[in-house]
Amino acid sequence: VGDDWQSIYRFSGSDMALFNQFPEYFGTTEINKIETTYRFGEPLVSLSSNFIQRNKAQIQKNIHSFSSEMRTELEFYAYDRRDYCNTIGQLVASIPSDKSIFLLGRYSFDDYYLSFMYQSIKEGNRFYYVIGGRKIEFLTVHKSKGLEANYVILLQCNKDTYGFPSQVSDDPVLNYVLTKSDQFPYGEERRLFYVAITRAKIKTLVLYDKRFPSVFVDEFLHPEKVSEESYVKHPNANKRWTRSADQFLLKLHNEG
């Protein structure tokens, strides 16, 4: 049992081909698709499904909600960098106090600006911000997989080296230990974005800098602006080989 739409751990050795090409590895196979979601409804069901299935390498599915009356919205908010924290505060204030909220970031440092304006609380491995008197958990999208909240606020969906999608390229030496990368532009990042926007039961709110919207944001709001050039990475977006990466390579080698 698995979901190739949510395969987001290539960096730790996950190989989507083992799932998508299962019959080639294990022979005669019967495939049964689970196409009912119990977390969210329309229009998010259709919007998220169309988004992830732009990559034809993903297994094609016809997802539907268990209830035709269930509604889950997907909204986008452009912010001015000077008013970024206030924008988040206003969004939080607009959400009923009895509803749960996640703040999600592509990177663990996507909450950087929040730390200047709002009180933070660390409880074990969990991290919160106090916004408008409410304690709201901040997580990376990777950590949020499998979790859910009534509302999700997705931070910093900008076109940047460390934006969403991330433009950072793996060092070529990692190809010796990691599985073959997705040939579809930003394939893994697309799956990660799908995971992010589908954590919500009521509404996902996507924040982006009005000057530098992510190509993923443009796919939803301005598809006419999207071209092949939109997916070209900046030539300087290369991950440097570091001592920690060297240790990671050695760990994978020792584990076989």
Residue ranges and their predicted role:
Residues 242-256:
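Short, amphipathic alpha-helical "recognition" segments used to contact nucleic acids or chromatin
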Residues 1-71, 166, 217:
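Conserved RecA-like helicase ATPase core segment
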